[in-house]
UniProtKB/Swiss-Prot annotation:
A GO molecular-function annotation: ATPase binding
Membrane-crossing segments per the record: 353-373, 412-432, 484-504, 518-538, 550-570, 587-607, 621-641
Main location (coarse class): membrane
Membrane topology: Multi-pass membrane protein
Keywords: Cell membrane, Hydrogen ion transport, Ion transport, Membrane, Transmembrane, Transmembrane helix, Transport
GO biological-process terms attached to the record: vacuolar acidification
Protein name according to UniProt: V-type ATP synthase subunit I
Pfam families found in the cross-reference section: V_ATPase_I_N (PF18670)
InterPro entries: V-ATPase_116kDa_su, V_ATPase_I_N
Summary of the function given for this chain in its UniProt record: Produces ATP from ADP in the presence of a proton gradient across the membrane.
Family: Belongs to the V-ATPase 116 kDa subunit family.
Residues spanning the signal sequence: none
Length: 690
């Protein structure tokens, strides 16, 4: 649900404003809204206030850049030094850290030069010998393809220099490196000849550019030989500095952020000569905390709390407040979506119910479900040990709280996958069918699904694996008999959610007294429902004559739906002239849910192929075939799962983001996230802004 908000206006004496703002930081409940106009000063600070803000921001930037250069995660909390020592603490860490960062950068640059040019420079040094120390001889190195001819270069040099040059070359890796030796006075002519031959001079980057080739080769040799050890030593030095300065740096950084936040509050408030006024929003259940905070200041503070007008107030922040089962989905899956508009519909619980259900229908494999369950339990184990997950390959770090939510969501999805795996009879594809655990019971299938007009053969042998322990009740791999049933089953979710979405549109329109959206929702609800009935009555276009059977209640309901669409469209034609086009589009939205069947069937077929290949090897080659079958089958399953898993996760999320939430109006408007003013540093140690 969306937490109900209350709007707050606070007026405070200017001399008490710093203490009040600091107390509001401690309370951590007020979401500030800028005051943009009025008789009092608003906007950027000026004078002494602006100077103090610039100084605090400068020191904060210095602290944050130092922490970034240290590459340290937040350590355990440390005491905050006295405010007078903050600059000393920051500069005391920044100077050695910046010097170390410069050395690390230079070493990294040298290692990169050696990786790129090292072999070529050593080859050039061998070719020129001691000529690179001669004052009379100029050396012009160059690079050319290993298979290219030097004839064009030789012709250009002979034309420019006559016989006052020599060229040597050597193949190095995929290229050929060469050098022109000529008189110092002819250096520019040799370079011009290189350009004429469409070649460029080989110039080394950085400090190596001015070195003789022999000296550069020796230096790059030292870099190659000792570079890794030097890098480890520098990294160890960085770790030592992080342990030495990190705790105090983080403490000062947090305190500086709090001070800058105080300046920010001033900037978004209305300022007079003797007073300061601010406005914002507080969740209704946290009003007592705000009142308790402000009551300590007596008559130095005056405030008023009044309800938010959810129909007309703009920029009211949103805080989603769900509990129990829904919360992990709010913190993970809903993070991929925008926030709902304040006063509208919170779809978190719908997502929490249907996304794992759809994922389970798509995967529907006990083996895969057990793998997901193991992964989810591993995530929960790390969270219980208060360990994070460093995904440095992706430049991310997942804290324990995030792992706890991800582990819960993964386990729910695994549970649905295992449940549907029992219904489809799939364990890593058809492995349990081969082992005689699952089997096709035609009599049972006829009793379950015969009402649809589908009939499985009277003899059990016609059903494939005819004996076993557990019967298959949702045989999606039997596409000949069950394909249409599975497809319609998937489309039923589309019918439910698309109509539900337009029903929410009507409900929200009534709630906000928005007649245009009420009639739009009614028109689309009736039109989409009529299209669905048209498809069922005509059997997907195979029997249009049934549409004229007015004795069928479904035909009358279909006509009522089209009438409702026409009436609704006439009421909102000016606002929504393309509503008939949208109606066709919404029919497509219902059909989009067929991907639950289609993607799931592809997943099942791929898993079946992987298992059948491994099983056939085990049957044909004997004991060695069993080993090969297990290894090859496992590798193929891993490969298929790695290629398709992301798509299987995203498909249910997409269905909710587009097909379900578009009709509700969820994607049309959003509200800012509730971000209350909070303190980062300990309340007792924070310095006051003067």
């Amino acid at each position: 649900m969306i937490s109900p908000m209350q709007q707050v206006v606070i007026a405070v004496r200017k001399r008490e404003s710093d203490n009040v703002i600091t107390a509001l930081q401690d309370a951590g409940v007020l979401h500030l809204r800028p005051i943009a106009e009025g008789p009092l000063s608003t906007g950027n600070l000026a004078g002494q206030d602006a100077q103090e803000r610039r100084e605090d921001e400068r020191l904060l930037a210095r602290a944050e850049s130092t922490i970034a250069e240290l590459g340290a995660y937040r350590p355990a909390p440390a005491p905050l030094p006295a405010q007078s020592e903050w600059e000393t603490v920051v500069e005391g860490a920044a100077q050695p850290v910046s010097h170390l960062a410069k050395r690390r950068q230079e070493l990294q640059s040298d290692l990169e030069v050696d990786r790129t040019y090292g072999d070529a420079v050593r080859a050039l040094a061998r070719m020129v010998g001691t000529l690179d120390r001669s004052r009379r001889v100029a050396l012009v190195p160059f690079l050319i393809g290993a298979t290219e001819n030097l004839g064009e270069l030789d012709g250009a040099l002979r034309e420019s220099l006559g016989d006052r040059y020599t060229v040597a070359s050597e193949v190095v890796g995929a290229n050929r490196v060469g050098v022109i030796a000529t008189l110092s006075a002819d250096r520019d002519a040799a370079r011009a000849a290189l350009s004429k031959a469409r070649l460029g001079e080989l110039r080394l980057p950085g400090r190596f550019d001015t070195m003789p080739l022999g000296a550069a080769a020796d230096e790059l040799g030292r870099v190659r030989q000792g570079g890794d050890d030097m890098q480890r030593a520098l990294n160890a030095e960085r770790d030592r500095l992080a342990q030495q300065h990190g705790p105090a740096l983080y403490a000062v950084r947090d305190a500086l952020k709090d001070r800058v936040a105080v300046h920010d509050v001033r900037a978004v408030s209305a300022r007079g000569k003797y007073s300061l006024a601010m406005q914002g929003y507080v969740p209704a259940d946290r009003i007592p905390a705000l009142q308790s905070t402000l009551s300590r200041f007596g008559d130095a503070v005056s405030y008023e709390v009044f309800p938010v007008d959810e129909h007309h107030d703009q920029d009211v922040p949103v805080e989603l407040k769900n509990s129990g089962y829904v919360t992990p989905f709010q913190n993970t899956v809903m993070g991929l979506m925008s926030l709902p508009k304040y006063g509208s519909f919170d779809p978190t619980w719908v997502v929490a119910l249907f996304v794992p259900l759809f994922f389970g229908i798509i995967m529907a494999d006990i083996g895969y479900g057990l793998l997901f369950l193991a992964f989810g339990m591993w995530l929960l184990g790390k969270a219980r040990r208060n360990e994070g997950w460093d995904l440095s390959l992706f430049g991310a770090y997942l804290p324990p709280a995030t792992l706890r939510d991800l582990g819960f969501v993964t386990n729910v999805m695994a549970g649905w996958t295992i449940l549907w795996g029992f219904l489809t009879g799939e364990f890593f594809g058809t492995l349990f069918e081969h082992l005689g655990v699952f089997y096709m019971n035609n009599d049972l299938l006829n009793r379950l699904w015969g009402w649809t007009g589908v009939h499985w053969g009277a003899h059990a042998a016609e059903g494939g694996h005819s004996t076993g322990l557990l019967p298959i009740v949702f045989p999606r791999l039997d596409t000949e008999n069950f394909g249409n049933i599975a497809l319609v089953f998937a489309l039923c979710f589309g019918i439910l959610q698309v109509l539900w979405g337009w029903g929410i549109r009507v409900q929200q329109g009534l709630k906000h007294n928005d007649q245009a959206h009420v009639w739009e929702g009614l028109a689309m609800f009736g039109g989409v429902g009529a299209l669905i009935l048209l498809g069922f009555i005509s059997k997907a276009g195979a029997d249009f004559g049934a549409l004229s059977n007015f004795g069928d209640w479904r035909v009358l309901l279909m006509i009522l739906g089209f009438v409702l669409f026409i009436v609704g469209y006439l009421r909102v034609a000016k606002q929504f002239p393309l509503l008939p086009v949208e109606l066709v589009s919404q029919g497509g939205s219902v059909v989009s849910y067929a991907r639950i069947f289609a993607v799931g069937l592809v997943s099942a077929i791929l898993a079946k192929l992987c298992t059948d290949l491994g099983w056939s090897l085990s049957q044909q080659i004997g004991f060695l075939g069993i080993i090969l079958g297990i290894v090859i089958g496992a590798l193929l399953h891993f490969f298929v799962l790695a290629l398709t898993l992301i798509g299987h996760i995203l498909q249910p999320i997409r269905l909710h983001m587009v097909e379900f939430l578009n009709p509700t109006g969820f994607n049309n408007e959003t509200s800012p996230r509730y971000a209350p003013l909070r303190r980062l540093s300990p309340a007792s140690d924070a310095g006051q802004v003067k």
